[in-house]
Amino acid sequence: CIRDRQSSALSSVDINDSVHYKGYPIYYKDKLYLRPKVLTDNLRFASGDLFNERDVQQTYSSFGRLSALKYTNIRFIETQVGDSTMLDCYVMLTKSKHKSVSFEVEGTNSAGDLGAAASVSFQNRNLFRGSETFMIKFRGAYEVISGLQAGYSNNNYTEYGVETSINFPNFLFPFISSDFKRKIRATTEFGLQYNYQLRPEFLRTMASANWSYKWTQRQKIQHRIDLINIAFLYLPRISERFKEDYINKGQNHIFQYNYQDRLIINMGYSYNYNSVGGSIINNTIASNSYSIRFNFESAGNVMYALSKAANIRKNSNGEYAILGIPYAQYLKGEFDFAKNIRIDYRNSFAFHAGVGIAVPYGNAKTIPFEKQYFSGGANSVRGWSVRDLGPGSFAGNGNLLDQSGDIKLDASIEYRSKLFWKFQGAVFIDAGNIWTIRSYANQPGGVFKFDRFYKQIAVAYGLGLRLDLDFFILRFDGGMKAVNPAYETRKEHFPIIHPKFSRD
């Protein structure tokens, strides 16, 4: 049986004050770091309960979720009371550093255009003495853009942004009882973001707000529910030259759609499973492991139903609008699988496969640009630059706009080997592409068709070098094109037969 009382076990602890809350004695030094209710709500056993190891582990897990705490230690001391053996329980908590400031500086190279970005963030891990985590981050970026035609006012790209969030270590929802909230071990997050982008072609601002929940199940499964996410995209200025060249011609409905003011109101759910849970030490997986990720997102359905019910008149483009601003409507789903196969201490294989699809309907004919897929780059098919591959067999037309799609397939296999010190080598093969759901005249070959999509899978190969510094991994990859779906002739379709560094 467990009981709570003061004992000589506290003689080694530096304390000078105490308080009683709901029958629990709480000892501390100078100032109580967390509210008493926070402490008692995270206990999974009470005085008088029979000892249960599962309750102890759940208590460790509950306190481990609190970012305001660094260490948790639960001690039991046997005490004889008459003919019974009792356990005196002491939960000892060590606070973490609750305030921190961090800086980040990065250099960018987008197809030869050099730039720089910097950010500063502040974090408070105990804002209201309940282990609430508050974060605010400021970011700025600058890039010189080359290859512009005449008619643009400048040749640089400037971006400013600020984001802030507050994370509560418990489930918050109105009209829900305290007992129910205590049983659901979820965190609640509220966030705000604002972004300002000034390019030669346009000036765009984006503002968003979100409300989400996250919780962990059996240490291996993570759930996230985005209850609501509201984003507003506003373009106060678009270059006349840009309108003339790309928008007013009416050749590409995607461009027209994405350079209009837009409202996105969406909700979603994501599921993540990792077979090793929290047993990863120094970025080294102790045994074979795998992970599964699933994500689902929908937008505009509630607003569309209300618009229909209220018999609201559509605008000139055939869209329902809120205060004159049309809203997006779509469904988006993603599935991702990754597996690590350890051969021995020095060698392993890593496999990854993913698929994603986004379908516009109802109030929209196109997916918002921010929700579309792109291919190429360090986290995709590494033989192509970011947003340089696809859609389908489309080779690109050299304009300023990135190519994107509604469907994405990705797969890779990588052999990794420890070289020396903290360096690791890698050999990889990547495959994948993106496609559009609808056919567009200025993107020939970009639409997805079952009888030919497999012929449009791009393949790349290459070598990589990893510097594993435990707290982060520095990665260098060099990829070459092996199969290029943009060309049909044998020599250009299979560049692996005739490799050329300047081309591939």
Residue ranges: model-predicted function:
Residues T85, L114-A118, N156-V162, L203-A207, ...:
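Residues that define the transmembrane beta-barrel architecture of outer-membrane proteins
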Residues L87, S348-F428, G432-Y440:
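Extracytoplasmic gating/loop element in the C-terminal half of outer-membrane beta-barrel translocons
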Residues R3-N109, R139, D179, L331-G333, ...:
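Periplasmic polypeptide-binding modules associated with outer-membrane biogenesis and secretion
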Residues G107-N109, N126, F138-V144, F168-N170, ...:
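Transmembrane beta-strands of outer-membrane beta-barrel pores
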Residues F76, K99-N109, A118-V120, S131-A150, ...:
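Transmembrane beta-strand segments that form the barrel wall of outer-membrane beta-barrel proteins
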Residues Y27-L34, S100, S153-G354:
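Transmembrane beta-strand segments of outer-membrane beta-barrel domains in Gram-negative
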Residues A118-N124, V162-F168, L192, A209-Y213, ...:
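Residues on the lipid-exposed face of transmembrane beta-strands in outer-membrane beta-barrel proteins
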Residues N347, W384, D470-D504:
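Predominantly the C-terminal beta-signal and adjacent terminal strand-loop region
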